[in-house]
């Protein structure tokens, strides 16, 4: 049956469905995010002009997540309060035991707690989670510029478009496709024009030999 972990990204506090909330996970439903579309009617022309990828990428709406739980309990009201006090109304990371390397992020709502024949039933839902499931750990890649002063780096990205935060121990220039920008030493930079695509992304670094450069970014997938 598995379990669910809920984590508050602000405080780091975590609740596991079975050991902390004393719930048995019965089923999980993870909906798909609808595609955001931009369609224009062209007077005098048949059909529609589809501009959905005018920004060079697919865009998505929110997605729903719902977890149905049950539990044999002696005190319905104590159980109801325990779960609602922990989760209800909070924007939380939701981890499923089948895929603990990713989490969904959304505002959680705890439904009505019903009891029938001593069995408690409750649905915990997050109807408007972010469209992507995020990697549990931020991706970090550190490289060192060789004596030549030039280094090619390939950054792997799961799927979600993301611009990495770049920090260097000395002044450096980063080139990515047609985008080139300079960074100062020991300052964090994020250039939204340097957005990683799914898969392999080639960058070039120009800096003094021995300069260390750190790339940090949040990966995600549908």
Predicted regions, residues:
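Short beta-strand and beta-hairpin "edge-sheet" elements
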Residues: 30-31, 89-132
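Short, acidic/charged, Gly/Pro-enriched secondary-structure junctions
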Residues: 5, 66-109
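Polar/acidic, low-complexity leader/linker segments enriched in S/T/G and N/D
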Residues: 1-39
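Intrinsically disordered, low-complexity segments enriched in serine, threonine, and glycine
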Residues: 132-222
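Short polybasic amphipathic segments
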Residues: 2-8, 92-94, 173-176
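Mixed-charge, glycine-accented linear interaction segment located at domain edges/termini
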Residues: 5, 10-11, 127-130, 195
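Oligomerization/assembly interface segments of phage tail-like spikes and tubes
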Residues: 38-43, 47-73, 118-132, 201
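Short amphipathic beta-strand/extended segments with alternating polar/hydrophobic composition
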Residues: 14-22, 103-110, 182-185
């Amino acid at each position: 049956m598995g379990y669910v972990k809920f984590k508050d990204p602000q405080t780091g506090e975590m609740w596991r469905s079975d050991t902390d909330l004393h719930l048995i996970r019965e089923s999980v439903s993870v909906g798909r995010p609808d595609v955001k579309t931009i369609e224009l009617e062209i007077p005098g022309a048949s059909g529609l002009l589809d501009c959905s990828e005018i920004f060079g990428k697919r865009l998505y709406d929110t997605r729903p997540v719902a977890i149905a739980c049950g539990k044999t309990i002696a005190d319905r009201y104590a159980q109801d309060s325990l779960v609602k006090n922990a989760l209800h109304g909070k924007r939380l990371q939701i981890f499923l035991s089948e895929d603990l390397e990713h989490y969904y992020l959304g505002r959680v709502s705890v439904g009505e707690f019903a009891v029938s024949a001593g069995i408690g039933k409750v649905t915990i839902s997050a109807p408007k989670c972010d469209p992507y499931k995020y990697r549990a750990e931020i991706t970090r890649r550190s490289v060192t510029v060789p004596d030549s002063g030039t280094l090619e780096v390939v950054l792997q990205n799961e799927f979600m478009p993301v611009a990495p935060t770049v920090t260097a121990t000395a002044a450096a220039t980063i080139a990515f496709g047609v985008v080139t920008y300079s960074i100062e030493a020991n300052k964090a930079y994020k250039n939204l024009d340097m957005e990683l695509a799914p898969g392999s992304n080639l960058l070039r670094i120009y800096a003094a030999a021995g300069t260390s450069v750190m790339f940090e970014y949040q990966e995600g997938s549908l």
